[in-house]
Amino acid sequence: MLILVSPAKTLDFEQPPLTQVYSQPDFLTHSQELIQVCRQLTPSDIATLMKVSDKIAGLNAARFGQWQPDFSLDNAKQAIFAFRGDVYTGFDADTLSEDEIAQTQSQLRILSGLYGLLRPLDLIMPYRLEMGTALSNPKGKNLYEFWGDTLTQAVNEALAESGSDIIVNLASNEYFKAIKPKKLQGQLISPVFKDCKNGQYKVISFFAKRARGMMARYIITNKVNTLAELRAFNLAGYYYSEEQSSPTNPTFLRAEQ
């Protein structure tokens, strides 16, 4: 199985990584193009474009200015250990074994507005550039037009290397929109996680993000290869609901927390 996840806004470049092993992102020339565009933006432009505070806009203007493509462990960090959002809390990369880190490197891919498609051990420098950002660039009016078919092709290549024909989409809609589903050369499965609230089951963003991270970790740790094994996911009180599921959207429910 090849697993797709989103990145996170929250970053940690303070804690040392779990391993000294790293790889370099595949699309750094693309990243450099975007950085050149972003460097032309003032902090005020960034605040408006990204809908962030002046403080965060200033921080990201500085990040764009400092960014350079010669990554090492002295100035960058592996993506899986740098991202610290709800998905990554659920994934809990800091407790991976060496074998699991290696497995994650071959099975997990992180969609990114700036870096395109990251392997877990790819080095990144701090940034904020969400995939849905309407950033005009030489290839179009937003990042979806900038990346075009590039990321879909990269996913197909990663899928072929994995030896599987199943893609488990645990990314948000914003990020998965950078992929062209009809051009994928495998079976696309997009799990859904619903929590009970006031007697009704619904997707609650905070819980669903954590569940997506937990499922990604579950696939790695348990060496899940089949859809039947995927449906056995039962962490944190979630259970598979055949009634609410469709062939491409296995749905997992959880009682009110």
UniProtKB/Swiss-Prot annotation:
Coiled coil location: none
GO CC terms, sorted: cytosol
Pfam family name, one: H2O2_YaaD
Segment forming the signal sequence: none
GO biological process: response to hydroperoxide
Alphabetical list of NCBIfam families matching this protein: PRK02101.1-1, PRK02101.1-3
UniProt family annotation: Belongs to the UPF0246 family.
PANTHER family on file: PEROXIDE STRESS RESISTANCE PROTEIN YAAA (PTHR30283:SF4), PEROXIDE STRESS RESPONSE PROTEIN YAAA (PTHR30283)
UniProt-recorded name of the protein: UPF0246 protein Sbal195_1149
Organism listed in the record: Shewanella baltica (strain OS195)
